[in-house]
């Protein structure tokens, strides 16, 4: 079984892999980083006009990093919008994924957070810098191989 976007991508010979459907019937597609920008543009033109969320996670210690996009197709007069989940996996060493900021402006802070916490560089993002951690922070705190710095917090004794 294929979702509508997946069937459209197959029809137009665009490389992707279906990872199945979640409990709500939303299909998850895997896209290669080098194909992501063109498929993101195609998705927008196809009608996925809203980026509901973007997040990232560390798949396994020493393994791949994943950037996840939840896209929604919002149409006037449609009560149940169509949704799709896109996963883009990047190599741990120098992870690079094209930014979708220029397609969906809501990707701005979300891609910055993924950069700040996991070190994924989003190519062509206009302000890719740390958003939660200080600029001087070393490392990527949400990576599974991250070693926390050895410091102690002074606490009030009450």
From Swiss-Prot:
GO cellular component terms attached to this protein's record: chloroplast thylakoid membrane
Molecular functions per Gene Ontology: NADH dehydrogenase (ubiquinone) activity; quinone binding
Subunit: NDH is composed of at least 16 different subunits, 5 of which are encoded in the nucleus.
Protein name (database record): NAD(P)H-quinone oxidoreductase subunit J, chloroplastic
Catalytic activity, EC: 7.1.1.-
Localization of this protein: Plastid, Chloroplast thylakoid membrane
Lineage, top ranks: Eukaryota, Viridiplantae, Streptophyta, Embryophyta, Tracheophyta
UniProt similarity note: Belongs to the complex I 30 kDa subunit family.
Alphabetically ordered keywords of this record: Chloroplast, Membrane, NAD, NADP, Plastid, Plastoquinone, Quinone, Thylakoid, Translocase, Transport
Role summary: NDH shuttles electrons from NAD(P)H:plastoquinone, via FMN and iron-sulfur (Fe-S) centers, to quinones in the photosynthetic chain and possibly in a chloroplast respiratory chain. The immediate electron acceptor for the enzyme in this species is believed to be plastoquinone. Couples the redox reaction to proton translocation, and thus conserves the redox energy in a proton gradient.
InterPro entries, per database record: NADH_DH_suC, NADH_quin_OxRdtase_su_C/D-like, NADH_UbQ_OxRdtase_30kDa_su, NADH_UbQ_OxRdtase_CS
Gene3D superfamilies: NADH:ubiquinone oxidoreductase, 30kDa subunit
Protein species of origin: Illicium oligandrum
Topology in the lipid bilayer: Peripheral membrane protein
Major localization class: plastid
A single BP term in Gene Ontology: photosynthesis, light reaction
Catalytic activity: a plastoquinone + NADH + (n+1) H(+)(in) = a plastoquinol + NAD(+) + n H(+)(out); a plastoquinone + NADPH + (n+1) H(+)(in) = a plastoquinol + NADP(+) + n H(+)(out)
């Amino acid at each position: 079984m294929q979702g509508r976007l997946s069937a459209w991508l197959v029809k137009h010979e665009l490389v992707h892999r279906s990872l199945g459907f979640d409990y709500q019937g939303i299909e998850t597609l895997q896209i290669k980083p080098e194909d992501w920008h063109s498929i993101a543009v195609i998705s927008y033109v196809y009608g996925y006009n809203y980026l509901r969320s973007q997040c990232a996670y560390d798949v396994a210690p020493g393994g791949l990093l994943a950037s996840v996009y939840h896209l929604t197709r919002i149409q006037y007069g449609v009560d149940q919008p169509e949704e799709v989940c896109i996963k883009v996996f990047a190599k741990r060493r120098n992870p690079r994924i094209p930014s979708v900021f220029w397609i969906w402006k809501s990707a701005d802070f979300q891609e910055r957070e993924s950069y700040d916490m996991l070190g994924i560089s989003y190519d062509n993002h206009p302000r890719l810098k740390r958003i939660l951690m200080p600029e001087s922070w070393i490392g990527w705190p949400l990576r599974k191989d991250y070693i926390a710095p050895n410091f102690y917090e002074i606490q009030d004794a009450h």
